[in-house]
């Protein structure tokens, strides 16, 4: 089944891409959720418009991503204070959303939580962690997060 994506789909493509998928995946997942439309001549013209708009935005996006990268690198180590149960174990865990909040609180830019990659699913110990931040295709940086006990 040939479809045109309307939004970014992980491991498949971005908005405006024409993709060939199995019928069941297209009918049962992509089409009902509005992630894709059936490829017709009119839809292909619409996809070309989406693609051109995305390319224009991408040029601005790379410049903006480099500015955000400079801002993050200028922060240095980001301190994240959490409640602990003793012996360095946390109550709960530190998620990507918590890291994004700590970066914002330290005077950094507002990021999407999907841009931050944690070493495992979540951070569950006190310590210093170096995390990857993917801002744009080809633009990434690292941020050091110091997880410390509250009080």
From Swiss-Prot:
Swiss-Prot/TrEMBL GO biological process terms: translation
Keywords assigned: Ribonucleoprotein, Ribosomal protein, RNA-binding, rRNA-binding
PROSITE patterns on file: RIBOSOMAL_L9
SUPFAM superfamilies registered for this protein in UniProt: L9 N-domain-like, Ribosomal protein L9 C-domain
Entry-linked InterPro entries: Ribosomal_bL9, Ribosomal_bL9/RNase_H1_N, Ribosomal_bL9_bac/chp, Ribosomal_bL9_C, Ribosomal_bL9_C_sf, Ribosomal_bL9_N, Ribosomal_bL9_N_sf
Coiled coil start-end: none
Keyword Protein biosynthesis appears in the UniProt entry: no
One GO molecular-function entry: rRNA binding
Keyword Cell division on entry: no
Any Pfam family hit: Ribosomal_L9_C
GO CC annotations on file: ribonucleoprotein complex; ribosome
PANTHER family: 50S RIBOSOMAL PROTEIN L9
Its biological purpose: Binds to the 23S rRNA.
Family: Belongs to the bacterial ribosomal protein bL9 family.
Protein name: Large ribosomal subunit protein bL9
Organism: Mycobacteroides abscessus (strain ATCC 19977 / DSM 44196 / CCUG 20993 / CIP 104536 / JCM 13569 / NCTC 13031 / TMC 1543 / L948) (Mycobacterium abscessus)
């Amino acid at each position: 089944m040939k479809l045109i994506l309307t939004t970014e789909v992980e491991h498949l493509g971005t908005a405006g891409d024409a993709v060939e998928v199995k019928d069941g995946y297209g009918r049962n997942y992509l089409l009902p959720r509005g992630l894709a439309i059936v490829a017709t001549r009119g839809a292909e013209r619409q996809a070309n418009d989406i693609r051109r708009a995305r390319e224009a935005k991408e040029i601005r996006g790379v410049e903006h991503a480099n500015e955000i990268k400079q801002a993050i690198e200028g922060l240095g180590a980001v301190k994240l204070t959490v409640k602990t149960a003793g012996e360095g174990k946390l109550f709960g865990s530190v998620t990507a959303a918590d890291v994004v909040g700590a970066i914002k609180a330290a005077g950094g830019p507002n990021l999407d939580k999907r841009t931050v990659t944690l070493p495992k699913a979540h951070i569950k110990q006190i310590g210093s962690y170096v995390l990857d931040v993917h801002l744009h295709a080809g633009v990434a940086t690292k941020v050091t997060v110091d997880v410390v006990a509250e009080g």
